[in-house]
């Protein structure tokens, strides 16, 4: 979760520098919320599984892996969406800085 928070701070800084439009801010905040909500669900699933059993059980592993996989998929999709949204402003910024 610390990595997600650090990335969120970097996105906020980049968005401010690039002056992205308001709708892109809205999408960014929705994606932040989605990833963080899934992190909380993942934490809850892991805590409940650990509370129920301390021994290895295939279904417990499946529950933990599925919850972690949901976070991973959401984070990867957020990165793809972020790259697509920031690309035009990023290219414009680079052209102004370089040329």
Predicted regions mapped to residue ranges:
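Amphipathic, hydrophobic secondary-structure cores in small proteins
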Residues: 39-43, 47-62, 66
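Hydrophobic alpha-helical transmembrane segments
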Residues: 1-36, 52, 56-58, 71-99
């Amino acid at each position: 979760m610390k990595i997600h928070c650090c990335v969120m701070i970097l996105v906020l800084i980049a968005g401010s520098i690039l002056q992205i439009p308001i709708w892109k801010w809205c999408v960014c905040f929705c994606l932040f919320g989605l990833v963080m909500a899934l992190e909380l669900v993942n934490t809850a699933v892991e805590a409940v599984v650990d509370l129920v059993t301390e021994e290895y059980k295939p279904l417990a592993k499946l529950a933990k892996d599925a919850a972690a996989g949901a976070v991973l998929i959401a984070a990867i999709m957020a990165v793809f969406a972020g790259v697509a949204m920031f690309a035009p402003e990023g290219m414009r910024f680079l052209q102004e800085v370089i040329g």
